[in-house]
Structure formats: structure tokens, C-alpha cells
């Protein structure tokens, strides 16, 4: 893995038998199915070893001085509302199943699809409808975080 000074990272296993991370300081972290994840500083030196032939990982990276990122792994059963504050950006990644954004002409989301949500004018919400599993990531400016 490349080193990225001043950057935070979060890795989440998407597919495969797993990934073992070996950090230079001796820490070992195993990402195992179905969707294990780990957050760490991009300043750290590490190597990754897949547990099988193929592994797929979602790699979120952000500048820690500029934004704060919160993530949630959630089931999607029916309707979920995502509340959007001005300046925030939400990543919705569909880990499994199908979903659609209500009140839009956007095509339905399938496993592996992602969508970015933003508040165009003031606080609002988007409604997701479907069934499956989601990874939600909220990106918020460090200046507005509590």
C-alpha cells in the first residue's frame, strides 16, 4: 500500500476470502468476510496479503485536516431516510440487494453501485427504498463538525 501523509483511510472488504494487513509497527489486522473494515492513518507503512486469489476492497481516503468522515454498515429493509445538511456529502454504496432513490428519475441501484448525495439548498433528506445492505459514509467539513 502507498503511504499518504496527512490522510486517513478506511478499508472495507467487499468480496473475496479476506485481506491481512501487516503494519510496519507489527500490528496485524485481518479483514474477513463478509464486510470487515479498519480505519488507520495513511502515514502508516503497511503491506497487504489477500487470503485467496481475488479480493475487492473499498478504499476511502480523506485529508484529516479538512474533513471528518463517519461510516455505517446498515441493512436496508424498506425505506431509509438520509438527512443532508448543507456542505455535507454522503456516499451510499450498495453492498448487496437493490435500491432506488425515491422522487428521482435515477436508475435503480444494484449491488456494487454507489451514489453521492448533497443538499442543494438548506437541510433536506433523500429517501432510499429497497432491500439489501448499505455502506453509508458522511463527509463533513472539519470547520462545521461538532
Regions found by a protein language model. Give the residues of each.
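Jelly-roll (double-stranded beta-helix
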Residues: 1-146
Amino acid at each position: 500500500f502507498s503511504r499518504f501523509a496527512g490522510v486517513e483511510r478506511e478499508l472495507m472488504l467487499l468480496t473475496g476470502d479476506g485481506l491481512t494487513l501487516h503494519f510496519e509497527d507489527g500490528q496485524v489486522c485481518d479483514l474477513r468476510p463478509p464486510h470487515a473494515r479498519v480505519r488507520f492513518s495513511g502515514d502508516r507503512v503497511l503491506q497487504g496479503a489477500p487470503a485467496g486469489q481475488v479480493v475487492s476492497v473499498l478504499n476511502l481516503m480523506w485529508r484529516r485536516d479538512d474533513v471528518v468522515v463517519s461510516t455505517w454498515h446498515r441493512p436496508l429493509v424498506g425505506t431509509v431516510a438520509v438527512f443532508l445538511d448543507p456542505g455535507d456529502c454522503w456516499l451510499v454504496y450498495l453492498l448487496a440487494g437493490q435500491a432506488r432513490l425515491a422522487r428521482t428519475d435515477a436508475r435503480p441501484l444494484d449491488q456494487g453501485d454507489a451514489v453521492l448525495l448533497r443538499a442543494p439548498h438548506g437541510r433536506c433528506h433523500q429517501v432510499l427504498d429497497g432491500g439489501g445492505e448499505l455502506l453509508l459514509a458522511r463527509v463533513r467539513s472539519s470547520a462545521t463538525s461538532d
